[in-house]
A protein has these predicted regions:
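Nucleotide-activated donor-binding/catalytic signature segment of Leloir-type glycosyltransferases, i.e.
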Residues: 227-233, 237-240, 245-274, 330, ...
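Short N-terminal targeting/anchoring amphipathic segment
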Residues: 23-45, 58-61
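A charged, aromatic-enriched C-terminal amphipathic alpha-helix characteristic of glycosyltransferases
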Residues: 357-369, 373-410
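Helix-loop-beta element that forms the nucleotide-linked donor phosphate-binding surface
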Residues: 102-103, 108-162
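Membrane-proximal helix-turn-helix segments that form the acceptor-binding/catalytic region
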Residues: 44-47, 51-55, 62, 68, ...
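Conserved donor-binding/catalytic core segment of Leloir-type glycosyltransferases
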Residues: 148-163, 171-199, 205-209, 237
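Nucleotide-sugar-dependent
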Residues: 199, 268-275, 280-302, 310-318, ...
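A conserved mid-protein helix/loop that constitutes part of the nucleotide-sugar donor-binding site
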Residues: 194-225, 246
Length: 410
């Protein structure tokens, strides 16, 4: 791509991938009974797999996780682009060649049948593998946090001058303590993002600015004990790589926050589930290019007993059972919190609720305040919700595969 025009480079890349796939599937591998293709991507894999299945008399099974043309539309200026329309036709035609289909949501299975005439799709929801689970052992938790602390560069205490006078006393904010739990002043919030246009990271930044205004407003003087504060400090760890990461990291450097620390990290594969296992709250900014898929990261968070704040879109209700007490709240720029009546009057949590859904930074900030209020004394809604998730039976991927997917191949 450094030496050729973009379109020509893409054509050459597709041709090379086509030859590699044809060789591997037609010559290098023995004749299969089934070919399972997860999509997207679909170019050139759709056409190659369909051809190989025809020649070698194998069954073509398509695992629909999203639609490639909708992802292309994010980069090509919308679904009206001629190239996007062509990609949609290709995906539809190739999809109809499948002998069996999996869909990740009920809504996607319905859409495939109604819009593309692809019926009989088996709904196969994602589920976390067994190694995603809560870490409640305090020794293991402390060991992990201490090991990650140098990479995250967590401060121990923040001081903010009250004003410009030389004799002014600094405002000393609570220390950033993550252990032991009984003296914990800091809630660990984790978000995994691909740093792409379908995940608006700016919403999280704006919400944290509003939360910081609320938490900073309540502080007056020193806080020698954790239970002197109503709202905890936040250590927000954002994992993942992607094209927009540098842009948002630049913006993060210019934030002046008193009670919130933001860190980006790329973790080893074995550390990511452990980080989820010791965290207090998860955030998902995924909104789906098609509006029909669900974020795998939320399944992983639930597998670790982690309540989630997720961006609101049509099918997210298939995964996140919303605590409606905090829906529609807001936070003003001066730190004023407005919660719905149910959130203000201590209404009981909705049965089975495992998170909240937000549509704006102000609503997300209000949910952070509502869920984390009382965190330092162990009486927050987030902690109660996490306890319920940890105790609830968790469906795992192995069970999903054996009960739902395997019969398609037998």
């Amino acid at each position: 791509q450094r030496y050729l025009p973009r379109v020509l480079a893409l054509v050459i890349r597709v041709l090379i991938q086509t030859m590699q796939m044809l060789w591997t599937m037609s010559v290098a591998l023995p004749r299969p009974t089934h070919v399972l293709l997860q999509t997207p991507p679909c170019v050139p894999s759709f056409a190659v797999c369909a051809l190989v299945c025809f020649v070698r008399r194998a069954k073509f099974v398509i695992d629909w996780h999203n639609f490639a043309y909708t992802l292309m539309a994010l980069k090509m200026g919308g679904r009206g682009s001629p190239l996007v329309r062509l990609a949609k036709i290709y995906e539809k035609m190739m999809g109809r060649l499948g002998h069996a289909h999996f869909a990740v949501t009920n809504a996607m299975a319905t859409w495939l049948e109604e819009e593309w005439g692809i019926g009989g799709a088996v709904v196969l929801h994602d589920a976390p593998p067994d190694f995603f689970g809560p870490i409640d052992d305090e020794t293991e938790r402390i060991e992990l946090l201490r090991r990650l602390q140098p990479a995250l560069k967590v401060p121990t205490r923040l001081k903010v001058p009250n004003d410009s006078r030389d004799d002014a006393t600094d405002t000393v904010y609570p220390p950033y303590t993550l252990w032991p739990r009984e003296d914990q002043t800091t809630a660990l919030v984790v978000s995994s993002t691909s740093w792409t246009p379908d995940e608006d990271f700016g919403i999280l930044l704006d919400a944290l600015i509003l939360y910081d205004a609320v938490a900073s407003k309540e502080q007056r003087g020193a806080f020698p004990r954790s239970y002197d504060i109503l709202y905890p400090n936040l250590l927000v760890v954002v994992t993942g790589k992607g094209p927009q990461r540098a842009h948002y990291e630049s913006r993060m450097k210019h934030l002046k926050l008193n009670r919130v620390v933001l860190r980006t990290a790329w973790l080893e594969s074995e550390d990511y589930p452990k980080l989820l296992g010791v965290s207090d709250l998860g955030v998902c900014l995924h909104t789906s290019s098609s509006g029909l898929d669900l974020p795998m990261k939320v399944y992983d968070m639930f597998g670790c007993g982690l309540p989630v704040l997720a961006a609101r879109y049509d099918v997210i209700h298939e995964l996140v059972r919303e605590d409606t007490r905090f829906a529609g709240g807001s936070v003003g720029v001066r730190g004023g919190v407005r919660l719905p009546e149910g959130g203000r009057k201590g209404k009981a949590r909705d049965v089975g609720a495992n998170g909240c859904l937000f549509s704006s930074p102000a609503e997300m900030a209000a949910q952070l305040c509502g869920l984390l209020r009382g965190f330092t004394i162990g009486q927050s809604e987030a902690q109660a919700m996490r306890g319920g998730l940890v105790e609830a039976p968790r469906r795992r991927w192995k069970q999903n595969w054996e009960e739902i997917a395997l019969p398609v191949f037998t």
